[in-house]
Amino acid sequence: MKIFTSAQIHELDKYTIEHEPISSLNLMERAAKALTRAIEEEWSNRTPVVVFAGPGNNGGDALAVARMLSEDGYDVSVYLFNVQNKLSADCLANRKRLLDAKRVKFTEITTNLDPPKLNAETLVVDGLFGSGLNKPLAGGFAAMVKYINQSPAKVVSIDIPSGLMTEDNSYNIHANIIRATLTLTLQQKKLSMLMADNQQYLGRLRVLDIRLSQEFIQNTECRCRILEENDIRPLLKSRSDFAHKGSMGNALLIAGSYGMSGASVLATKACLRTGAGKVTAHTPKRNYEIMQISVPEAVLQMDAEETIFSEPVDTEMFDALGVGPGLGQNETTAIALIAQLRRATCPLVIDADALNILSSHRAWMQQLPKNIIMTPHPKEFDRLAGNANSSCTERLMKASELAERLQAYIILKGHYSALCHPDGKIDFCSTGNSGMATAGSGDVLTGIITGLLARGYKQEDACRLGMHLHGLAGDLAAKDLGKESLIASDIIQYLPKAFLRLEE
């Protein structure tokens, strides 16, 4: 699914109108029918409905929905905000249709509003502002939003909660954004809907197909998109009947320190489960027995030190290197790490403590080879970028800038993990769940991507497929085990089922 900007959304509407062809009013009617069906699936006609409509096309949608709900037996009250006596043409047309129907209680607001009482039984339809909003709400609209938010009523937002902007909300006034129970967005998700700090406004999110031009959608370039199963399935390589361990890739993982051997175990197991033919784990001597017992399929390469990573490893014989899980941040380890990164001769994944070491030695990042893969969680990235208290959108844009500057791939982990490409493109992962918010989950991702690289996947494809497999395995595990008790080992256990799902 492509994620269009507000300007592109406007162009998509315009193109559909011109090339279907269909009038803008009839397109609004089509959208309103889809919205009405979705509302009626959730609430019966015994639910009192209060519609708040703005002066633009989002308000026009809301007026059309009000008319359709009233025709289906709902008790509907409508409040149309027309303070400047300036309605959009389609909003004005739907105002006339609504008044002609004579089924609803209609109030047009031209000065101050004495707001209606909203109780727990009330359903509010929020049609104040849509995806064209480009500045924070203020004045009477802000007061109206606060009034709705303070009420116990359920709220359905049309396309996007009023006050929430389509892209960047870093400088928005968060008290002036509707907190919806359900958001019914039209055709495609918006970028702001993928940001964790905006989830409090969306409630449940549904995407409604209103049959906008598929030709425009397919042919229009965009910076951001959500990767879905149909995008991922073609990336999966077929396995030759004549494959042997030498042809399936040789991976090296540098992971673990004293007390953190589990990180090495998880990354190594995940790498093996991803189909790498041979996996070598480089780890401190003290971890020997744990690793030998926990992952008998792996080859062990012991560091000279008992408890830390202390010396770079020759990577000539390896097809991919993953470094960082449980590594520790000892100064000796830091020096060994930069030496290792400088001399790496194969595709490289950097995670966890390796990222934390780079955060403390930021100048070293300029010495990194091109096309490396970095997999920070938000706090790791903030340390890496020297940035504190970023909004999710700011963090994403900084990750994209860093990926371009370093010519690297950066996976910013989260509910919608974001893959930032060296060319500025951003891919969001559609799989994964909150049960995966558990220690070791990131180590598993490092192992998966390292395994895919070893098997010969390009960095771009290893990231896309790795993110999807990681999240899909977590989703399949959560379906069987529940989210509450999910642990990182479960993700590894369900990797085979994730592969089978993609092979169907």
Where are the regions that the model predicts?
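Internal gly/pro-rich beta-alpha loop/helix module
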Residues: 121-123, 128-222
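Small-residue (G/A/S/T)-rich helix-start motifs and N-terminal tracts that mark the onset
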Residues: 1-82, 88, 193-348, 352, ...
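Amphipathic alpha-helical segments in well-structured domains
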Residues: 94-95, 141-145, 180, 334-337, ...
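Short acidic-hydrophobic sequence patches enriched in Asp/Glu that either
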Residues: 87-90, 140, 175-178, 283, ...
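A structural motif corresponding to the C-terminal end of an alpha-helix
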Residues: 103-104, 150-153, 405-408
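N-terminal small/polar loop signature for handling phosphorylated ligands or for N-terminal nucleophile
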Residues: 64-149, 289-301, 310-313
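Short acidic loop-to-helix transition motifs that present clustered carboxylates
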Residues: 112-114, 160-166, 191, 306-308, ...
